[in-house]
Amino acid sequence: MAYNNKNYLEKIKQAVEVTKAHYEPGRKTVAILTTGGTIAGSGEIGKETGYVPGALSAEELIASVPQLSESVNIRAVEICSVNSDDITGEIWIHMARTINELAQDDEIAGFVVTHGTDTLEESAYFLDLTVKTDKPVVLTGAMRPATSLSADGAMSLYQAVCAAADKKSVGLGVLCVFSDQIFSARAVGKSSTYQVTAISGGETGCLGVVRNDEVFYYQAPLRRHTTASEFDVSAISRLPKVEILYFYVDADPAIVEFAAARSDG
């Protein structure tokens, strides 16, 4: 599915919608940015495969978890609606700039990004390097579509909002919430194509957990991120094209020449 973002400011203006039905002055506001993926997927009731990723709009996804608006105000921002395999550098830039723009709003306490799991770790790390705010930015997703038996997306989204609204999450960089655990964007990875515990923190483990609406942290990331990062996407519309090549026994050296002729580095 193609992504088109010719007019950034107009896209921002059209994308931001405040959910007014449960809006209460004085409560924290969490902006939920949706990009599609399994968490917004829809298919045959009870089936875990053969679904359409990104079928639910931002409003439909948020409405499917009514508990979200019980303690915080929700602002829905639809970035795109794609399978995470179709996420592009242009979408990354749009996402980072949207967060940076909205972070200037004092009413917004934090952000949640719903995302497909195949490239979630890449998007999380990109945002960790390019978002310019100490406000919590939390990515989450699902391994099963909303129409599946024992779907995991609703709880992940709810716990991500809990983490984004918690003041203890401020200044920790971009985070990922899955299966009750909170991971650093720098360490998070996907280790399974079907298990609901597929997202993990690798050798570093998790930073903390979400239990009964409460957020607990046990450690903090020490590497530079967000406001301390030197990367700035405010004035660019595309990323340099850099290929990553994997080599193996008897690999054809011509692969390097092919990639070099079609990339910036």
Per-region residue spans from a language model:
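ATP/NTP phosphate-donor binding region
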Residues: 2-102
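Accessory alpha-helical/coil subdomains and C-terminal extensions
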Residues: 27-29, 33-34, 57-68, 184-265
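Short beta-strand segments
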Residues: 33-35, 113-115, 138-141, 173-179, ...
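Gly/Ser/Thr-rich loops at beta-strand to alpha-helix junctions
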Residues: 34-40, 115-121, 181-183
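Short glycine/serine/threonine-rich phosphate/pyrophosphate-binding segments
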Residues: 41-42, 118-124, 153-157
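Short acidic, glycine-rich surface-loop motifs adjacent to enzyme active sites
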Residues: 105-120, 263-265
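Short Gly/Thr/Asp-enriched flexible loops that form oxyanion-binding sites at enzyme active sites
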Residues: 113-135
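Internal gly/pro-rich beta-alpha loop/helix module
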Residues: 139-212
